[in-house]
Structures are given as C-alpha cells and as structure tokens.
C-alpha cells in the first residue's frame, strides 16, 4: 500500500492539496454532488494532488500548472527556495479571493521557510480560518473574535 505523507500534498506554490475538496472527496463522499454541480467531471475525482500528477491537474484551464513546471525547472521543492522568489506567479490577486486560498501563497511560503512543512500543515486550519473569516484591523492584520 502506497501511503501519501501530508507533506507530499503541499504543492511547490504552498497550496495544500490535502485540504482541497477535490482531494478530500476520496474520504468524504458527501462532497461529490457539490463538486459535480460545480462542473467537475466524475472521472476526475478524486484528485491525487499536484505532485502525484507532476503538475498535470485536470482542474486547470491549461492542463499543467506553470508554477509546478517552474519549480521543477528550477529544481526546488517550494517556490521560496528559488533565487527569483518572490515572483509574479505568487502575487496576490483580488479575483476569487473570497473562495480560493491563492492569496495565502506568500504567507505560506514564508511560514514553510521559517518553520518547515510539518509546522505549516499544523498551522493551516488557523491560517485558512484567519483568511476566510478574519476581519482586517488596521495595524493588526486579520483578526478573529477570539483574538480580542
């Protein structure tokens, strides 16, 4: 039996594939109807994570992830290990920021660099909660009710 380690589910750009519904559907069948409603093809489920398919994600518009290709060409595990870090591929964007964690990439890269991938995985639930539910407080960053 081939066991996937959680750190193998961290993409080079630091998106955690192990927290994605496309991956989680393998253990959570209740997600399947929701994913199908959003246009995901049944034969594309579950997604094994980007490292398992060498960045050839069926859920991307172009087929292969440019960030994955770049990391592979530069021979780095994570983008922060690259001499060109940070680059525009990791630049935050407001587009779909309310539903996708893409704007976490820079923070995640810095966190992995300083604390390691295992600590990043442990911190992810708080990071996602702070990103999706936090309220900006000038000079303090995103705040949660329990921070007050």
Task: Report each predicted region and the residues it spans.
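Cysteine-centered metal-binding/redox modules
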Residues: 1-148
